[in-house]
Amino acid sequence: MINLLDFNKTELVRFCGEMGEKPYRARQLLRWVHQSGKTDFMEMSDLAKGFRHKLMECAVVQLPEIVSDHTAGDGTRKWLLSTGAGNAVEMVFIPEPSRGTLCVSSQVGCALACSFCSTGRQGFNRNLSVAEIIGQLWWANRLLEAGSHDPFPLDTTRVQTDKPETRRPVTNVVMMGMGEPLANFENLVTALDLMLSDDAYGLSRRRVTVSTSGLVPALDRLRERCPVALAVSLHAPNDALRDQLVPINKKYPIRDLLAACERYLPAAPRDFITFEYVMLKGVNDSVALARELVQLVRNVPCKLNLIPFNAFSGSGYERSGAEAIGNFRDVLMQAGIVTTVRKTRGDDIAAACGQLAGQVRDKTRRTSGCGTGQPAVAR
């Protein structure tokens, strides 16, 4: 059976054509599935009955299964979605008065093995399908519209948009969950197409952000195929330190990464790149490194986002203190670089990316008598 959640509009037009249907049927299907949240073809009332019966014979709308739902005291909400074989991925909703941001995963685990990342410690299992990526947004809109566990509902009067579609609970999407989005390139781009489509979620390019650790060739392809807002996980101002924290830097060093960022800017929906910098106590948080960072990025239109480290068991790192973060920020701001410190959210629900999914995987392995290596099969 074909899962229609795997198709963007172009692919749905082709699919409908193969069934002898007009292109407008694709638009109808997109709206029923992504805007109305329907998964039963018989409820799609403006489709001809004959077409609905044909769809039932060859297609489904199959979503990933929600296996747990956690809400923090600050309103942050994290869901776990089963991906089979005892594995799970996470999506996180961060409510604010003027926006609702959904953090979306792109892979089960991650092969890049960043030393401070809980997901990276789990290793790589597989890429998520388009349905598993876009299904996170589908689920978030449905669950949040239901109103349960949402102490901070979106104030739509403060949302800067002309599109009624973005008055749904999720107004912004950041591809900053589990996995390296650009390592799952084709599925990522198809999911982005759906996020941006007026027949699906109607988000603007400025409200969709892809975060990357620095896959330079794929970054160039994203610029050509679907340029959305860009965030780069930098975390160090020199190759020696970044090689330790972000091993992909050995293949695509900082000089090549910054050159790719400069190539990306003319196509980007924003006139700057966001550089993310996790603050690790005694590792990358000194004033000297802040000054080095100023020299590195001063000619690139950018914003720096300093991220207090979310500790997890066995990480070997600690979060920088408030004074160290403040001193680091001050050096950047005094140099004229727009700098923010990310507000820590969801500390009471295992906020570190991949932490809850890792707990599920570890529990499954223990139950099945498995050690490291191939993932256990859930029973």
UniProtKB/Swiss-Prot annotation:
Ranges where the Radical SAM core domain occurs: 96-348
Cofactor(s) it depends on: [4Fe-4S] cluster
Disulfide-bonded cysteines: C103-C353
Residues that hold [4Fe-4S] cluster according to the record: C110, C114, C117
Subcellular location: Cytoplasm
Keyword Chaperone: no
Alphabetical list of Pfam families matching this protein: Radical_SAM (PF04055), RlmN_N (PF21016)
Catalytically driven reaction(s): adenosine(2503) in 23S rRNA + 2 reduced [2Fe-2S]-[ferredoxin] + 2 S-adenosyl-L-methionine = 2-methyladenosine(2503) in 23S rRNA + 5'-deoxyadenosine + L-methionine + 2 oxidized [2Fe-2S]-[ferredoxin] + S-adenosyl-L-homocysteine; adenosine(37) in tRNA + 2 reduced [2Fe-2S]-[ferredoxin] + 2 S-adenosyl-L-methionine = 2-methyladenosine(37) in tRNA + 5'-deoxyadenosine + L-methionine + 2 oxidized [2Fe-2S]-[ferredoxin] + S-adenosyl-L-homocysteine
Record-listed E.C. numbers: 2.1.1.192
Active site (UniProt): E90 (proton acceptor), C353 (s-methylcysteine intermediate)
Keywords: 4Fe-4S, Cytoplasm, Disulfide bond, Iron, Iron-sulfur, Metal-binding, Methyltransferase, rRNA processing, S-adenosyl-L-methionine, Transferase, tRNA processing
Cofactor binding, per record: Binds 1 [4Fe-4S] cluster. The cluster is coordinated with 3 cysteines and an exchangeable S-adenosyl-L-methionine.
Gene3D superfamilies, per the entry: 1.10.150.530, Aldolase class I
BP-aspect Gene Ontology terms: rRNA base methylation; tRNA methylation
Annotated Gene Ontology cellular component terms: cytoplasm
Positions that bind S-adenosyl-L-methionine: G179, E180, S211, S233, L234, H235, N310
Keyword S-adenosyl-L-methionine carried by entry: yes
MF terms (GO), sorted A to Z: 4 iron, 4 sulfur cluster binding; metal ion binding; rRNA (adenine(2503)-C2-)-methyltransferase activity; rRNA binding; tRNA (adenine(37)-C2)-methyltransferase activity; tRNA binding
Family indicated by similarity: Belongs to the radical SAM superfamily. RlmN family.
Function, as annotated: Specifically methylates position 2 of adenine 2503 in 23S rRNA and position 2 of adenine 37 in tRNAs. m2A2503 modification seems to play a crucial role in the proofreading step occurring at the peptidyl transferase center and thus would serve to optimize ribosomal fidelity.
UniProt miscellaneous comment: Reaction proceeds by a ping-pong mechanism involving intermediate methylation of a conserved cysteine residue.
Protein name: Dual-specificity RNA methyltransferase RlmN
Gene: rlmN
